């Protein structure tokens, strides 16, 4: 294939990949109904008046800024697109996820080229799909996606020129670009006026990169204007009067131990969602360590010898191990339970309530409801983790990463030597550290829900992609292991994607029936509606986000928006 034909092929493959990502996300967004906070934001904030014009959008954003919080940019976008209509919002939200996938790929490659690595773009989208905590809440639900997804896109876009400038600086080049002075300032304002932890990280990074460039004689004016813009946005974010109103209500009486506990819980939840990413990063690190050690590799009787930069391969017998048998047994048990009523999760739930919560006196109805809600998703999450661990166990066998070989390589090559010898590993380590520090900023917040780790999880994904983009690292993944990873990726996407589409469609149909019932009731002059409870609580590993109408936020907002006096839903009945 000639270079021209190869370029055309990659362009077509990239366009096809992007179209597939957009179409999938558009379908999810189309079937996801408006609910919960969406109704509050369809009205001018705290007035009960539906938004009917652009001036109402601006007025609502200002009211929110004064009374609730500083995220004025994201609130403006949310109010604007809710006013413009759901179809346009669906398309814009799908486009934002595609943009984030592209930006994560570009940061991983440290290149703004779009069409050279369609496979890396597909992998970026897949890993974001699997690894972003509470995906349905932060990337599909409108009120959540505008806060997290729509904040991450301008922030990652803003940081890309700094990243590229640092790269060319290391190659002895300079990135002046005088035309970028004003655009970078404006983009900096958007990036800084986003969400609290990401805004702080972006501002510090911008000033840090600017100072580093100045000390190395590669300073460009756009670096400083961008940093100043980010600082201006950050000030606008944190100085909002509404922040102090909300903090007084949520966190004024919370001590440092509560903040530390929130930090541990938030970081821990993120790492659980990042399990496939972390295992692949660890595998890449061990492969680099083994390559640098020069040790021969044995894979079930197959001898791999490092000869220069090539591998000499014999044969592979394969085999069944105790670990794989244990993992398969647990997987089959949980799968059988999942499709026959969830009796394993129910047994664990009842045992914890009887043996832990009851002796501690934690048996309030809300506590039991919240714990039951967690256990409703236990089996599908456990099945997901076990499938990943099985894949990881088999991949180690195919790559010859036995305990003995890993220990032998570690004795000869330290982690410091790996970082010195592998630029991709150094860059990935920086991204991982950046993600952890980005979360650490939230120690000042009264709460730290798992969804707030959104941008940090994206940084971890970029770290893995940076490793896999490096030819010296990628070559360590032998062909059978690559085939296994492709098959596993396809199965995980097919399972989670199909489940998310089906469940979202089901929730959308149920919600549409309720809206029709409300409209019929209002046409008859009635102000009270009765809904049956939606019994299906499965959420496809949190890729679907929907709360029934007995939730106070949904009920109160919908009553005000539709002019109702009461919405009645039967109480929850634990299975």
Predicted segments with their positions:
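Transmembrane alpha-helical segments
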Residues: 97-108, 154-166, 203-211, 276-287, ...
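Alpha-helical transmembrane segments
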Residues: 10-24, 119-126, 182-186, 225-233, ...
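Membrane-interface alpha helices of multi-pass inner-membrane proteins
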Residues: 177-196
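Transmembrane catalytic cores of multi-pass membrane glycosyltransferases
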Residues: 27-87, 91, 142, 194-410, ...
């Amino acid at each position: 294939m000639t270079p021209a034909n190869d370029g055309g092929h990659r362009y077509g493959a990239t366009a096809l990949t992007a179209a597939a990502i957009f179409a999938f996300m558009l379908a999810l967004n189309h079937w996801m109904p408006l609910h919960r906070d969406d109704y509050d934001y369809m009205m001018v904030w705290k007035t009960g008046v539906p938004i009917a014009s652009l001036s109402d959008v601006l007025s609502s954003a200002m009211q929110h800024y004064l009374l609730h919080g500083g995220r004025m940019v994201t609130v403006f976008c949310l109010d604007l697109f809710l006013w413009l209509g759901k179809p346009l919002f669906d398309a814009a939200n799908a486009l934002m996820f595609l943009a984030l996938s592209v930006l994560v790929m570009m940061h991983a490659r440290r290149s703004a080229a779009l069409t050279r690595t369609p496979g890396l773009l597909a992998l970026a989208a897949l890993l974001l799909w699997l690894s972003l905590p509470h995906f349905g809440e932060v990337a599909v639900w409108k009120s959540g996606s505008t806060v997290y997804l729509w904040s991450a896109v301008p922030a990652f876009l803003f940081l890309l020129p700094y990243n590229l400038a640092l790269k060319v600086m290391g190659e002895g080049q300079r990135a002046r670009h005088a035309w970028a002075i004003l655009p970078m300032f404006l983009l900096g304002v958007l990036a800084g006026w986003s969400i609290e932890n990401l805004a702080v990280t972006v501002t510090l990074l911008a000033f840090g990169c600017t100072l580093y460039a100045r000390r190395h004689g590669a300073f460009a004016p756009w670096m400083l204007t961008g940093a100043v813009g980010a600082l201006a946005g950050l000030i606008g974010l944190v100085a909002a009067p509404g922040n102090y109103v909300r903090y007084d209500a949520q966190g004024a009486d919370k001590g440092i131990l509560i903040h530390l506990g929130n930090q541990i819980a938030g970081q821990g939840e993120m790492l659980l969602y990042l399990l496939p990413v972390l295992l692949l990063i660890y595998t890449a690190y061990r492969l680099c360590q083994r390559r640098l050690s020069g040790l021969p590799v044995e894979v079930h009787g197959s001898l791999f010898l490092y000869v220069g930069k090539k591998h000499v391969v014999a044969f592979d017998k394969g085999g069944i191990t105790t670990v794989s048998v244990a993992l398969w047994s647990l997987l089959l048990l949980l799968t059988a339970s999942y499709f026959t009523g969830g009796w394993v999760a129910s047994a664990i739930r009842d045992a914890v309530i009887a043996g832990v919560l009851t002796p501690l006196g934690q048996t309030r109805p809300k506590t039991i409801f919240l714990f039951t809600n967690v256990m409703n998703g236990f089996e599908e999450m456990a099945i997901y983790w076990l499938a990943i661990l099985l894949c990881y166990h088999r991949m180690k066998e195919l790559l010859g990463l036995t305990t003995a070989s890993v220990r032998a390589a570690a004795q000869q090559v330290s982690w410091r030597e790996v970082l010195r010898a592998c630029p991709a590993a150094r860059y990935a380590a920086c991204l991982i550290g950046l993600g952890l520090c980005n979360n650490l900023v939230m120690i000042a917040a009264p709460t730290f829900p798992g969804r707030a780790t959104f941008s940090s999880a994206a940084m971890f994904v970029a770290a893995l992609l940076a490793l896999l983009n490096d030819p010296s690292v990628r070559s360590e993944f032998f062909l059978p292991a690559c085939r296994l990873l492709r098959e596993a990726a396809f199965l995980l996407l097919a399972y989670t994607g199909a489940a998310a589409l089906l469940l979202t469609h089901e929730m959308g149909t149920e919600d549409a029936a309720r809206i029709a019932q409300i409209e019929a009731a209002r046409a008859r002059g009635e102000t009270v509606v009765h809904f049956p409870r939606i019994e299906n609580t499965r959420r496809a590993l949190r890729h679907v986000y929907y709360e029934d109408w007995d939730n106070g936020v949904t009920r109160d907002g919908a009553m005000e928006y539709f002019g109702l006096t009461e919405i009645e839903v039967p109480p929850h009945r634990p299975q």
